Amino acid sequence: MAILNTKIVSGELIGVTSATQLPDIACNRVTLKAQQDNPTFVYIGGAGVTKAGGSTNATTGIQLDASEQITLEISNLNLLYRICDATGDDLTYIAETSAA
């Protein structure tokens, strides 16, 4: 089945240890994948996302181990934030956008 009027955008984001917004890319769907050689975890969530800390809270992001991925239907990557356990925890993305 052909997908018409679609553009694919992909990239890599280096690991950061403070909550950081993803790029401003309008999209319909995005797949985020933790790099295969990441030593620890990447967390994906909303503004103010935090790492898992062993307590109940409303800010801990979805944890991605090395090679794990998540696909979301979302209107813009910039609605998501990431935080990593270490600066070596990189994240890749591939987003489906409407072609202009």
Features from the language model and the residues they span:
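Beta-sandwich interaction modules
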Residues: 61-77
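Short, surface-exposed beta-strand/strand-loop-strand elements in extracellular ectodomains
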Residues: 35-56, 92-94
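N-terminal compositionally biased, intrinsically disordered segments and leader/signal-like regions
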Residues: 7, 18-21, 32, 51, ...
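Surface-exposed ligand/attachment interfaces on beta-rich extracellular proteins
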Residues: 2-26
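Noncatalytic modules at the cell exterior or secretory-pathway interfaces
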Residues: 28-30, 72-89
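Residue-level detector of conserved, well-ordered beta-strand and adjacent loop positions
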Residues: 10, 45, 65
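Forkhead-associated
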Residues: 25-37
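Low-complexity intrinsically disordered segments
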Residues: 84, 90-100
